[in-house]
A protein has these predicted regions:
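Alpha-helical recognition segments enriched in aromatics with Gly/Pro capping
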Residues: 1-33, 48, 119-325
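N-terminal, positively charged nucleic-acid-binding surface of large information/translation enzymes
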Residues: 9-14, 18-106
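Short catalytic-loop micro-motif centered on adjacent basic/acidic residues
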Residues: 63-64, 108-112, 222-224, 382
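Short, glycine/charge-rich beta-strand/loop segments that flank catalytic centers
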Residues: 67-71, 92-96, 106-121, 139-148
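Structural preference for alpha-helix termini/caps and helix-kink/transition segments
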Residues: 264, 273-444
Length: 444
């Protein structure tokens, strides 16, 4: 039984899908005007692990994540580079997908773009205007938050508790300071014709329409970073309530932010860490291990200390797996697919509890300890070795961490034999030579 913390209810709830055995999940994607930073990478990993968990528990998953390829920042960059918005957007979409691949994430099944959904966005806004939930003002269109009594249910703030200017745009055209733009009149950059004149859509409408268009009127899980809870997800939910009279998602799941050396990552501090640079520097496995080492609802700190701690932890896990594989191969023992089901089940139970990765890591360490104890026996029970090793590999697979299996052919077996014989003969020069060759092959 999978249980998730629902931001909307402030409770950890049993997951009950709309369609039995299937999960529909939408995660807000990037506005593509720059490269992905490590803060963008966290939800990539968090929701990839969640998807893998559902699949491990027997669910099928439809995973949708959008690209916002229309935005003032994209238009500004296109003007600065004397090119089109489409060129800018495609550059950063390609870069974003590259990071997803480098992180070994399972790519979303559907990646809709705003520009490909424009007709339906305009139709959606027009219906909101005609039903009295939105109004036109000098070519702009605003959503009336007072028209939806449930406004504030995602961020748990009532209108009278909100502070004007807190991540919202204020102007004299609005009937209420918290009314938000559905359509923006413009004569600059890319624009589309609409019943209200030329313009482009507001950010908050795009995701609702893409969810309705690609999945349906209600989805199982809507995910994203905690910074999207208000106003973005709040405004999405309000539009859905106004249009269809129902909740947009049954479970709202948000990951916490990423800090750098204990400080918030920001341009002003100059401490932005680009995701591609991090992965190329640390490697896929270490990056994923570090990100998942902290519960997704707690802030994650990137520092030399946390990186080194994660490196040591991961080495303690992967090294015994490699040793087990090599020793079995040298003993001509072929490991099957069977695994320690009790340990693997305990691991999944931890993740089923609101993706409690720290507790899941404890199960990994416990199983690795059993593996090490078995490997130290005078007469190694390779059947038991295989059970523990395969269980840990399955656990790591759910976390998106790849376990390499070294090639152990006759050449490698002969090299091990020469190394062992040289040590037995106390021929240390030869032993060092053979050992170095084994190290170069990644076998030691």
């Amino acid at each position: 039984m999978i249980r998730l913390y629902n931001t909307k209810t402030l409770q950890i709830e049993e997951f009950k899908p709309i369609h039995e055995g299937h999960v529909d999940m939408y995660v807000c994607g990037p506005t593509v005007y720059n490269y992905a930073h490590i803060g963008n990478a966290r939800p990539m990993i968090v929701f990839d692990v969640l998807k893998r968990l559902f699949e491990a528990e027997g669910y099928s998953v439809t995973y949708v994540s959008n690209f916002t390829d229309v935005d003032d920042k994209i238009i500004k960059k296109a003007a600065e580079e004397n090119t089109t918005e489409a060129v800018i957007a495609q550059r950063y979409i390609d870069a974003y997908q590259e990071v997803r691949t480098l992180l070994n994430t399972e790519l979303p099944d559907i990646t809709p773009r705003v520009t490909e959904t424009m007709d339906k966005i305009i139709e959606f806004i027009d219906k909101l205007v005609k039903t009295g939930h939105a109004y036109e003002a000098n070519g702009d269109v605003y959503f009336s938050v007072e028209s939806v009594p449930t406004y504030g249910e995602i961020s748990h703030q009532h209108l009278d508790q909100l502070e004007a200017g807190a991540r919202i745009e204020t102007n004299d055209q609005k009937k209420n300071p918290y009314d938000f733009a559905l359509w923006k009149k413009t004569d600059m950059g890319i624009k589309w014709n609409s019943p209200w004149g030329e313009g482009r859509p507001g950010w908050h409408t795009e995701c609702v329409v893409m969810i309705n268009d690609n999945i349906g009127d209600c989805i199982d899980i809507h995910g994203g970073g905690m910074d999207l809870k208000f106003p973005h997800h709040e405004n999405e939910a309000a539009q859905q309530e106004a249009m269809h009279g129902n909740t947009l998602a049954n479970y709202w799941v948000h990951n916490a932010m990423v800090n750098i050396d204990g400080q918030k990552m920001s341009k002003s501090l100059g401490n932005t860490m680009w995701a591609k640079d991090v992965v190329l520097s640390l490697g896929t496995n270490l990056t994923r291990w570090l990100v998942s080492s902290v519960h997704y609802r707690k802030e994650l700190n990137f520092s030399d200390e946390t990186i080194e701690t994660a490196r040591k932890e991961l080495d303690k896990v992967l090294t015994p797996l490699k040793q087990a594989y090599i020793k079995a191969a040298l003993a001509n023992y072929v490991m099957g697919d069977d695994y320690d089901k009790e340990s693997y089940r305990a691991f999944l139970d931890c993740l089923d509890d609101d993706m409690n990765t720290p507790n899941a890591y404890a199960i990994i360490f416990e199983t690795v300890k059993k593996l090490n104890q078995t490997l130290r026996q005078r007469e190694i029970d390779f059947a038991q070795v295989a059970l523990y090793r395969n269980a840990v590999e399955k656990m790591l697979n759910v976390l998106g961490i790849v376990v390499d299996k070294p090639v152990i052919g006759e050449t490698e077996k002969e090299l091990f034999a020469k190394w062992n014989q040289a040590k037995a003969d106390k021929d240390f020069d030869s032993a060092d030579k053979y050992r170095n060759e084994l190290v170069e092959k990644g076998l030691l």
